[in-house]
Amino acid sequence: MDQLIQLVEATQSRTDFPVINPGDTVRIQLKVIEGEKERLQAYEGVVISDRGAGASKTITVRKISHGVGVERIIPVNSPNVESVTVLKHGKARRAKLFYLRKRTGKAALKVKERKFPVKA
């Protein structure tokens, strides 16, 4: 059974996805279908969490939009994810940055920048 799961995950997993850690600021291009039209929508924010592994891996991205915090859980292997760009590598001492939810203003997105990014 484990071999079957590994085989399916190997065929379904994306290889063009960059290394993303909590604290990184990312821009994700998502496919949005409105009626018959399909367009790309950019979603930019701080990665506050990553879960799972393989085909079921997800990341939680948080941004502040018009003074309101917005979080989105994005499946890494979703066909609706067109591309992911890492804008800044953040330095975080926690695996989950849920404490950013309590902060307001600029402090809500403030994470120290990592001088030397982690290599894959």
Swiss-Prot record:
Q: Does the keyword Ribosomal protein apply?
A: yes
Q: Output the superkingdom of the source species.
A: Bacteria
Question: Which is one GO molecular function term here?
Answer: structural constituent of ribosome
Q: Name one GO biological process term.
A: translation
Q: Where are the transmembrane segments?
A: none
Keywords carried by this UniProt record: Ribonucleoprotein, Ribosomal protein
Q: One GO term of the cellular component aspect?
A: cytosolic large ribosomal subunit
Q: Name one Pfam family in it.
A: Ribosomal_L19
Family that this chain belongs to:
Belongs to the bacterial ribosomal protein bL19 family.
| Role summary | This protein is located at the 30S-50S ribosomal subunit interface and may play a role in the structure and function of the aminoacyl-tRNA binding site.
Name of the protein this chain belongs to: Large ribosomal subunit protein bL19
